[in-house]
């Protein structure tokens, strides 16, 4: 059996089933540990996955808005539609005529999507008429399934029951597809819709709808969950710029009536680390920036004797700088993509004076303590580029906001602050670590928002000249 035709307590193997035995143990447990994806999948399913709970503690809570956006999203792909048709024929003997009509309308629908999209992800801004035509054929299958009693399964009651469960599962998938197609035919301003394709041929193409503001769903299906009396949200990067450092996070997940607190770090940042902000760097949008950044990175690595993460906001910038200096460095050097992520981390830990060039996946979730990592170099303030349809739509909504909110102040800036704090946080992992963070973006000092971001970073000494930093004979960086 699979989840579609599981008979649950009517199955003769129910008492021996690993899944239900795990569920029974979870029901008895005082503490249940799950990841963010499972927590939000339970919320999206209206509590059908996890046992009831009265206290929720969420670590690394800054991820919740993005996880929630994914959890409450809807998706329809050409491969998914084909799989549904195959399932309907094999599992419940759906009429060939209806399936043929779905396949025909589906082909026309996805062909239109492929011709309408010019990028890997293309936002949909206008109604798509073909969506209504595909929806009409899906309704035919749904009505047929809802009318079936499966009385032809006369030999085995269990087979009839499994067929009913399969039909119910297919109807559930159809309902999700029909909701998405309705958003395509009749756009809803509260939803963001885009087309994704794997290549120009459209061998895999999908349309996705995501909530513009997931806080409504989080509030209704998680924060106000029956039985939940209180919740705790923790992260080293929740606080951002502004009078209320937690305002951005509270807005994105729908929190109110909170008791909030910033707990001091156990690390002595003033003595363990410094932030190097080089002078006279070009603006990041100037063509001179990357060559100057490459020169500055070489100088910094000479001081740190390698032992560095060099973090970029884009793969293109990483590759460009690596091509400029990677072969000339006096230290073992690799970049993201040279091998799988975990292998790169293992290589870094095992290699003396290693230098690792990386992008988004190395900004967080990597912990290198001790002498192996003495320096973290960041190319620029990590403002999100507006090629993400959800981010673009949220910026557009704030530009039209009548409450005086700003897309930059209320979205772009706090998001970048959180991201920068994550990158900076790679350096000091224990009370004995020391080292240097270098941020090559001149806006950290030339712009008011850059100085505001700087105030949100750990209280490290600010250094403007590399000769203010000296390297002890053994180990890590110290400040004169």
What are these regions (language model features)?
Residues 1-480:
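ASCE RecA-like P-loop NTPase motor cores
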């Amino acid at each position: 059996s699979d989840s579609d035709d599981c008979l649950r307590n009517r199955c003769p193997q129910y008492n021996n089933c690993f899944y239900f035995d795990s569920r029974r143990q979870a029901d008895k447990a005082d503490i249940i540990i799950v990841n963010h994806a499972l927590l939000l999948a339970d919320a999206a399913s209206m509590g059908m996955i996890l046992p009831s709970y009265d206290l929720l503690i969420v670590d690394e809570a800054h991820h919740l808005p993005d996880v929630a956006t994914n959890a409450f999203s809807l998706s329809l792909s050409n491969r998914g539609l084909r799989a549904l048709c195959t399932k309907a024929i094999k599992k419940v003997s759906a009429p060939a005529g209806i399936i043929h009509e779905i396949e025909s309308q589906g082909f026309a629908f996805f062909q239109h999507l492929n011709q309408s999209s010019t990028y890997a992800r293309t936002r949909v801004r206008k109604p798509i008429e073909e969506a209504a035509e595909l929806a009409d054929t899906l309704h035919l299958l749904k009505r047929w399934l809802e009318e079936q009693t499966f009385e032809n399964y006369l030999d085995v009651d269990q087979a009839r029951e499994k067929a009913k469960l399969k039909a119910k599962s297919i109807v559930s998938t159809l309902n999700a597809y029909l909701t998405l197609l309705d958003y395509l035919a009749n756009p809803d301003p509260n939803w963001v819709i885009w087309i994704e394709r794997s290549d120009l041929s459209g061998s895999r193409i999908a349309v996705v709808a995501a909530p513009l503001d997931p806080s409504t769903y989080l509030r209704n299906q998680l924060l106000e969950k029956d039985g939940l009396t209180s919740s705790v949200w923790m992260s080293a990067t929740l606080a951002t710029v502004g009078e209320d450092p937690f305002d951005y996070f509270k807005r994105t997940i729908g929190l109110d009536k909170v008791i909030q607190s910033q707990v001091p770090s156990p690390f002595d940042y003033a003595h363990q680390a410094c932030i190097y902000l080089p002078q006279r760097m070009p603006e990041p949008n100037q063509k001179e920036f990357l060559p100057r950044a490459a020169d500055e990175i070489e100088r910094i690595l000479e001081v740190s004797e390698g032992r560095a993460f060099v973090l970029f906001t884009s793969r293109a910038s990483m590759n460009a700088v690596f091509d400029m200096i990677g072969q000339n460095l006096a230290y073992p050097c690799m970049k993201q993509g040279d091998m799988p992520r975990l292998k790169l981390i293992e290589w870094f830990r095992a290699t003396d004076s290693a230098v690792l060039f990386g992008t988004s996946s190395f900004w967080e979730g990597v912990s290198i303590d001790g002498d192996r990592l003495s320096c973290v170099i960041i190319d620029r303030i990590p403002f999100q580029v507006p090629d993400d349809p959800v981010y673009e739509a949220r910026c557009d909504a704030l530009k039209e906001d009548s409450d005086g909110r700003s897309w930059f102040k209320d979205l772009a800036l706090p998001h970048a602050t959180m991201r920068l704090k994550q990158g900076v946080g790679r350096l000091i992992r224990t009370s004995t670590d020391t080292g240097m963070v270098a941020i090559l973006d001149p806006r950290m000092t030339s712009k008011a928002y850059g100085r505001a971001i700087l105030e949100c970073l750990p209280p490290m000494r600010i250094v403007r000249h590399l000769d203010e930093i000296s390297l002890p004979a053994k180990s890590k960086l110290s400040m004169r």
